[in-house]
Regions:
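Catalytic phosphate-donor-binding core of small-molecule kinases
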Residues: 11, 130, 209
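A glycine-rich beta-strand to alpha-helix segment
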Residues: 81-90
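A glycine/threonine-rich phosphate-anchoring loop and its flanking beta-alpha core
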Residues: 97-192
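Oxyanion-binding "anion nests"
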Residues: 187-211
């Protein structure tokens, strides 16, 4: 689902009201903790457990997994709890994996904050961490309970992150050869054009689902 900030809040609230988790565990990268999490109402719930990870692939280690699982046990997280992952692909990989094996699986919601994770990393149900220098060698195929993509977050990205995601969109456009490619030819749109970004992300998600 591609939404705006206020819609993410209402969707999260609806999901929480329906699922009634006993605890909410927020996993966030350092950058998303500073730039994205404060814009979500979930940040204001004082009973939330917030676990912060370093940015990028350095977070995807067994050491961080063990530390995170220990933190959840100390806070008496149960199978009725939910993990909400806020960040790029590395955070989603980490949180999805940890959720899939803790107590044989607890609920997990993805809120991707980078362009690459919105159009690619959050789809497919792949989770994983790196081990002994091999990327994603330990992992599971576990789909999250929900994915909420917020295009408002794109304006917080550095140029390198935008270009990384745009490269993936170009690849999708070449492979699809129709709508996405036509949009790619128009160049990177202004972040003020939220409707265009929402449609662009939507087209990429649909392409990923049929591959």
């Amino acid at each position: 689902m591609i939404v705006k900030t206020e819609t993410i809040d209402s969707r999260l609230e609806n999901w929480i009201n329906e699922y009634q988790p006993d605890k909410i565990v927020v996993v966030s990268s350092e950058t998303s903790f500073k730039l994205c999490l404060p814009h979500l109402s979930i940040h204001k719930k004082i009973d939330n457990i917030i676990y912060r990870l370093p940015d990028g692939e350095s977070a995807k280690t067994i050491d961080y997994c063990q530390d995170f699982w220990s933190a959840m046990m100390r806070n008496e997280v149960t199978r009725k709890s939910v993990i909400i992952a806020i960040g790029g692909g590395a955070v989603l990989d980490f949180a999805g994996f940890c959720a899939s094996v803790f107590m044989r699986g607890i609920a997990c919601i993805y809120i991707p904050t980078t362009l690459l994770s919105m159009v690619d990393g959050s789809e497919g149900g792949k989770t994983g961490i790196n081990f002994y220098g091999t990327k994603n060698i330990i992992g599971t195929f576990t789909k999250p309970n929900a994915i909420l993509r917020n295009v408002d977050f794109l304006s917080s990205l550095p140029q390198t992150e935008v270009l990384s995601g745009w490269a993936e969109i170009i690849k999708h456009g070449i492979l699809q050869g129709s709508v996405i490619w036509d949009m790619v030819k128009n160049g990177i749109p202004s972040f003020d054009d939220e409707e265009y970004w929402m449609e662009l992300v939507r087209q990429n998600i649909q392409f990923k689902k049929i591959r």
